[in-house]
Amino acid sequence: MNTVRQKQTVKPNYAFVDAQNLHLGAKEAGLELDYRRFRVYLKEKYRVGKAYLFIGFMPANRDLYEDLQENGFILKFKPVIVPNDGRKPKGDVDADVAFSIMRYYKEYDKAVIVTSDGDFDTVVKYLNKKDKLAAVISPNRAKCSALLKIAAKDKMQYLEDLYGKVSKRKAMQGENEKAPPGDETQGSAFS
């Protein structure tokens, strides 16, 4: 009896990155993130084949977007709303991130979610229950939602713990931190 064994293909893991949360969280933690090294880390540590980065679109930041794409991120843009009342520009991506996590659910083995936002606790609980969560990486331990920590359980990781692997340097307290390339405008693409 001839039995043909089909070669099992292992699905890649996918990363879903809340860019504003990552940028501001790293900055507040005193870290200057190296996006190229961060993308390599995601690939080597978590077998991330596709890394979706959700970001507000501002035409002035085209160079930044090109750099991020060259570093291996797949950009998912959200229009940025610029209020007339002096508030910072805003490009809310939370719903887009959660939707994409579920949209691509059958394509990936496990998800890596990069955020500190408690709004993701429901999707993180669900992924954990279904054994589809590789990790939640919080950009800032001090600002990480307690709900997110509870939902992620033992799969919680903090950007500060990756110092030297994914950050160029640790900014000194009070030191002016240089904005990412193309992010010198009043509003940031990460807003």
Residue ranges and their predicted role:
Residues 1-191:
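Terminal and domain-boundary accessory regions
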